[in-house]
């Protein structure tokens, strides 16, 4: 049986969300005898050196990744997340280029975005994950737009041949099960590989409320705001 490896994880360096501290993360991964772990903070590599040193010291394989917001038709009002992982040095270099360009050329209302055109120029050594229900394929599936989901998945499969994966997860969010079954059906039809992920923002369930507080501070909302979107689960 293939060992489970976390490929979607935000640390405290994500700034927008995430409470995970590098030292605690590596300790937990080593404790669970997991061979590797990825850190995919939002559009930054701030914690990368600390992550690399701690992982290597513990005998854990570090995987460098990043969550990016991709503009549809260069329109930041129509953007969706995409997770990219570095396979090698070339992939790491390409991810650093994308992050830098997002901040120097892609900022909108103070937030960094990337263009599909930039992705098309930086595919070497990069693995792409669909971000499940939140990604562009997932949103099409949840909207019961099968043809659009097929078109979008086919685009990513062509851009990242044998390196694009549809994510499957059960995080307790609304729509998870609907997306999972639709994604499996789509993957079978396209012969697209799938990967199980868990959208990690904290290490222990009791940290959920603290994480919600952090998110509220960022969004300028209060915990008891009935209009506040609930993006996370315990």
Stretches found by the model and what they are:
Residues 1-234:
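Phosphodiester-processing cores and adjacent nucleic acid-binding clamps
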């Amino acid at each position: 049986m293939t060992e489970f490896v976390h490929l979607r994880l935000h640390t405290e360096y994500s700034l927008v969300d995430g409470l995970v501290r590098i030292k605690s993360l590596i300790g937990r991964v080593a404790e669970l005898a997991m061979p590797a772990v990825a850190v995919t903070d939002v559009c930054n590599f701030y914690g990368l050196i600390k992550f690399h040193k701690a992982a290597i010291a513990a005998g854990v394989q570090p995987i460098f990744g990043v969550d990016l917001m991709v503009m549809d038709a260069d329109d930041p009002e129509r953007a969706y997340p995409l997770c990219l992982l570095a396979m090698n040095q070339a992939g790491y270099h390409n991810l650093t280029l994308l992050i830098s360009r997002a901040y120097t050329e892609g900022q909108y209302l103070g937030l960094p975005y990337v263009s599909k055109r930039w992705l098309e120029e930086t595919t070497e050594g990069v693995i792409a994950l669909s971000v499940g229900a939140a990604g562009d394929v997932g949103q099409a599936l949840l909207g019961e737009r099968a043809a659009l989901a097929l078109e979008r998945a086919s685009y990513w499969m062509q851009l990242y041949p044998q390196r694009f994966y549809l994510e499957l997860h059960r995080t307790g969010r609304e729509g998870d099960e609907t997306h999972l079954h639709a994604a499996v059906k789509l993957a079978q039809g396209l012969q697209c590989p799938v990967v199980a992920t868990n959208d990690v923002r904290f290490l222990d369930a009791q940290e959920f409320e603290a994480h919600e507080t952090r998110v509220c501070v960022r969004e300028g909302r209060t915990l008891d705001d009935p209009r506040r979107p609930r993006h996370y689960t315990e």
